[in-house]
Amino acid sequence: MKNVQTLKNYIGGQWIESTSKQVEDVPNPATGEIIARVPLSTKEDLDRAVATAKEAFKTWRKVAVPRRARILFRYQQLLIENWEGLAKLVTLENGKSYKEAYGEVQRGIECVEFAAGAPTLMMGEQLPDIATGVESGMYRYPIGVIAGITPFNFPMMVPCWMFPLAIACGNTFVLKPSERTPLLANRIAELFKEAGLPDGVLNIVHGAHDVVNGILDNEDVKAVSFVGSQPVAEYIYKTAAANGKRVQALAGAKNHSIVLKDADLSSTVKEITSAAFGSAGERCMAAAVVVVEEDVADELVNRLLQEANAITIGNGLEEGVFLGPVIREGHKERTLGYIQSGVEQGATLIRDGREDDIANSQGYFVGPTIFDNVTQEMKIWQDEIFAPVLSIVRVKDLMEAIHVANASPFANGACLYTNSAKAIREFREEIDAGMLGVNLGVPAPMAFFPFSGYKKSFYGDLHANGKDGVEFYTRKKMLTARY
């Protein structure tokens, strides 16, 4: 039997065994093979990491901002040099195709690049003459120990949304990565240390509920950034805020793609197919629902079916694979339950991903699944499935399509496929979502713009990334002086 390592926590620049005896297997989702074991760390482990980060903050906050930036530039270079290995590790523990993993690493590197602009990002503001002989200035400062709680679906990109910018702003950080994808977090911590980051500035504590609750209860944690499911996001937001912490919690999604009759169907079908089935549908920007004008619905459905049938399913490390597995057997069973629900509630199942056979595989595969004639009363329209399941709703016109999309309790993203400038303006003004796309499938912004939406897709005031991220990780002091 292959010897499987049990991961350690990263505290104060050292790899330290958890005080917990509980561990959880980490399988390769494409094969079922156990590749590591992750400790379900205790509150004691978490408190030790926070205390270490608090002590490191005393000196890190006083490090000159340009020096912090130079460390981040070295870190960026190391990530670039290790790009392929990082991408393979993402695929190994998450299951997405190597091509998608390679792109995810790129997005993480871009986040570090943005954070390296800290000398500009941290600038304050001054007004020399607010009154005769009186001037006033705003100065930015770090806030202390930040905690990040990240999901399994982007083990590289989402942590890189958080800790590089927080650290660039002078904070110290405790990261709790998903227990389902813990390997990548350890690797990027190693590279940050190699780049010259002082011990204690970045710490990693593996685990589940006990670590999360420890973060929320620890008074030395000043802010919490979270990305994950809606129920957990709501819990974290309410609990952290009640404990006086600054909090941003990015939650679920049910993104609608609206297709008008004047759309270029060739490019539209390719965009929707990639957005719906890429990363096995396990992303908050996935295309979950297509809302199409009746005049082109039949043709669109036929083309989507043809495109889905051409998808190669398998181990993401194999050449040419587009669709990998979902993350765990339990998530596969949950997805199959939603497919059965769609059938029972009367949707037309035009492609059944349950029938895709992956030869000799013990992995957690679900093939591309497409439902037509979906209505708002159905669970497959209402719930975030987080899997390669696409629902199609037929409507008469753009306003009905917007009405359908806005009826969702989620408001993360939405897309419009059209050649009409008037329709684009109407869509922009009337749609209730935070990230909008026109003639593209995944309108995720770059690191210098804020990420996230509204309603049950986001809890908080300041979004991740961009200027919002800088605001979240800093506090302001106003100095008014008479001379």
UniProtKB/Swiss-Prot annotation:
Pfam families: Aldedh
Key words, A-Z: NAD, Oxidoreductase
Its EC number(s): 1.2.1.27
Pathway: Polyol metabolism; myo-inositol degradation into acetyl-CoA; acetyl-CoA from myo-inositol: step 7/7
Keyword NAD attributed: yes
Annotated active site: 284
Record-level GO BP terms: inositol catabolic process; thymine catabolic process; valine catabolic process
Catalytic activity of the protein: 3-oxopropanoate + NAD(+) + CoA + H2O = hydrogencarbonate + acetyl-CoA + NADH + H(+); 2-methyl-3-oxopropanoate + NAD(+) + CoA + H2O = propanoyl-CoA + hydrogencarbonate + NADH + H(+)
Keyword Oxidoreductase carried by entry: yes
GO molecular function: malonate-semialdehyde dehydrogenase (acetylating) activity; methylmalonate-semialdehyde dehydrogenase (acylating, NAD) activity
HAMAP family the UniProt entry points to: IolA
Function: Catalyzes the oxidation of malonate semialdehyde (MSA) and methylmalonate semialdehyde (MMSA) into acetyl-CoA and propanoyl-CoA, respectively. Is involved in a myo-inositol catabolic pathway. Bicarbonate, and not CO2, is the end-product of the enzymatic reaction.
Entry similarity comment: Belongs to the aldehyde dehydrogenase family. IolA subfamily.
Assembly and oligomerization: Homotetramer.
Protein name: Malonate-semialdehyde dehydrogenase 2
Species this chain originates from: Bacillus mycoides (strain KBAB4)
Gene: iolA2
